Regions:
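Surface-exposed beta-strand edges and their flanking turn/coil or helix-capping segments
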Residues: 12-14, 48-49, 60-62, 75, ...
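Short, well-ordered beta-strand segments in beta-rich or mixed alpha/beta enzyme
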Residues: 1-2, 37-61
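An amphipathic, aromatic/His-enriched active-site/gating alpha helix that lines ligand/cofactor pockets
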Residues: 51-79
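Short S/T/G/P-rich N-terminal loop/turn motif that feeds into the first structured element of a domain
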Residues: 1-27, 32, 43, 55, ...
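A short linear hydrophobic-aromatic micro-motif
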Residues: 30-37, 72-74
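Flexible, active-site-adjacent loop/turn segments at secondary-structure boundaries
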Residues: 9-10, 38, 76
Length: 103
């Protein structure tokens, strides 16, 4: 996520534990914040969040966005290696069923 300039100014003026703030919201939605890292580059912070479903994650994004302190965010859904291997097996069984466009 990236903070607005106003949020960055507020954090500099009055430092606060943003991990605790994020954990409070995520816990209220039934999720778990595994870790939060501050970063520099395209984004200001990265959070590793575990949630019961996509609805919970969307609700969290909406709640944070409604606060007005975030200028942009990016979500990457992760899967375990076991789930990825199961997907590979499924793809192997289905790959012949797909006919790419030709022309």
């Amino acid at each position: 996520l990236s903070y607005t300039s106003e949020a960055a100014k507020a954090m500099i003026t009055s430092p606060s534990d943003r991990k605790a703030a994020a954990a409070s919201l995520i816990n209220a939605l039934g999720g778990k914040l595994h870790e939060m890292y501050f970063s520099f580059g395209d984004y200001d912070a990265v959070c590793l969040i575990e949630g019961p479903d996509d609805k919970m994650m969307a609700a969290g994004a909406m709640a944070v966005g409604a606060g007005g302190s975030i200028s942009k965010a990016h979500t990457t859904k992760l899967m375990s290696v076991d789930d990825a291997m199961a997907a590979m097996t499924m793809a192997g069984k289905a790959v012949g069923a797909y006919k790419p466009p030709v022309g």
